[in-house]
């Protein structure tokens, strides 16, 4: 089994990991958040969701895939009360047919202390 690391030069990693790994015809994306130019971008849950999905789209682009090829999405929210507002942006940005999805109220995510409200990881087909 081969593992091919994927990293976009437009995004930065916040730790010792790859932004994605290609293996077995699938792309496994690490969690993305509302980060631009290496810095967290505070904002509403809608703004953070939009930027987070844009970051995932960039990683998928570099991997040779796209949001259209998503098969599974995991969303981590710091506050489940943000679910409906996050969902509005999610529905707007992701094409049908929608991927399988899990959304969890995680309480804290790595950027919580800076105001981070959401982290999204995904699996896509090549």
From Swiss-Prot:
Coiled coil: none annotated. One of its GO terms (molecular function) is deaminase activity. The keyword Ligase does not apply. It is found in: Mitochondrion; Cytoplasm. Keywords: Cytoplasm, Mitochondrion, Transit peptide. The keyword Cytoplasm applies. It comes from the Eukaryota. One of its GO terms (cellular component) is mitochondrial matrix. Plays a role in the maintenance of mitochondrial DNA. Belongs to the RutC family. NCBIfam families: Rid family detoxifying hydrolase. This is Protein mmf2, mitochondrial.
